[in-house]
């Protein structure tokens, strides 16, 4: 898919934008009331669903200017929510940061300074399981066909969620997961990592924020231990390669990675959840 095709995809998603509903539900931490944004597919259903987990910058546009709601979601999150709704899925974008007092998220390079209350390995998984509980209670959702997708910090949450040591209830957890450019340092886990359901991990060679070699070694180790993990590394792509902004998509490696990610993620979830 060339640059024109990528732009055509983005335009098509805008033209077929799904309705976005603001919803609230408790985290499985039993003390946080979460806000989330539900993209609804057309048709009577029932439908499978995908939980979306934002990165360190949070779910909102950098131009939000203090307004943090459905009208100021970042283009990337809106794009993916529309993409899944257009293909017959509910998509639920969970805001883990605003309810804890950090609506604008965190800048690059701030990992060591972030509070433990937004930990991607021990706290945010409980938010994801809260989202899972919420979706399973919705009449139009197929309760045993719910996947999860995350970016960067949210992708680290995905890896934590899919571990058989996950905070929450992994034995009755997500059907499948997509993790885009995680860091792969799973400090919260003891011993080998074992996934309880299939994972698609997507990494960029020119990532400016995380070391792709760490993820490559992690993926090889996890696969060797018998976990169902599919790994793809994109030459010439950087962190946040699927950002629809023109600056990111002007990089050829990012465009190629974006094209493949949309196609690969769609095929992956279709194979795992529409059986």
Task: Specify the residue positions occupied by each region the protein language model found.
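Primarily recognizes the serine-hydrolase "nucleophile elbow" in alpha/beta-hydrolase
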Residues: 59, 118-195
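N-terminal cap/lid segment of alpha/beta-hydrolase-fold proteins
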Residues: 18-45
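C-terminal catalytic histidine-bearing segment of alpha/beta-hydrolase fold enzymes
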Residues: 228-275
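Acidic beta-to-alpha connecting loop that harbors the catalytic carboxylate
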Residues: 205-208, 236-238
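Short beta-strand/loop motif that positions the catalytic acidic residue
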Residues: 195, 201-203, 207
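Short alpha-helix in the alpha/beta-hydrolase fold that links the catalytic acid
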Residues: 65-66, 211-221
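Sec-dependent N-terminal signal peptides
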Residues: 4-14
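Serine-hydrolase catalytic machinery in alpha/beta-hydrolase-like enzymes
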Residues: 35, 49-134, 243-248
């Amino acid at each position: 898919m060339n640059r024109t095709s990528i732009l055509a995809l983005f335009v098509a998603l805008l033209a077929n934008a799904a309705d976005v509903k603001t919803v609230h539900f408790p985290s499985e931490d039993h003390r946080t009331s979460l806000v989330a944004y539900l993209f609804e597919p057309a048709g009577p259903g029932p439908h499978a669903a995908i939980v979306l987990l934002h990165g360190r910058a949070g779910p909102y546009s950098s131009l939000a200017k203090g307004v943090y709601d459905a009208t100021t979601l970042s283009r990337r999150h809106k794009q993916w929510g529309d993409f899944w709704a257009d293909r017959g899925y509910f998509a639920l974008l969970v805001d883990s940061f605003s309810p804890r007092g950090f609506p604008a998220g965190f800048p690059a390079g701030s990992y060591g300074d972030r509070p433990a209350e937004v930990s991607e390995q021990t706290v945010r998984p409980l938010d994801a399981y809260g989202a899972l509980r919420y979706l399973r209670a919705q009449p139009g959702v197929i309760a045993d066909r719910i996947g999860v997708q995350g970016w960067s910090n949210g992708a680290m949450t995905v890896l934590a969620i899919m571990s058989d040591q996950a905070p929450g209830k992994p034995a009755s957890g997500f059907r499948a997961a997509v993790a885009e450019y995680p860091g792969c340092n799973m400090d919260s886990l003891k011993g080998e990592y074992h996934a309880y359901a299939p994972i698609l991990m997507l990494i960029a060679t020119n990532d400016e924020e995380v070391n792709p070699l760490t993820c490559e070694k992690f993926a090889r180790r996890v696969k060797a231990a018998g976990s169902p993990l599919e790994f793809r590394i994109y030459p010439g792509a950087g962190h946040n390669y699927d950002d629809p902004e023109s600056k990111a998509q002007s990089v050829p490696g990012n465009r190629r990675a974006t094209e493949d990610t949309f196609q690969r993620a769609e095929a992956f979830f279709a194979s795992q959840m529409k059986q």
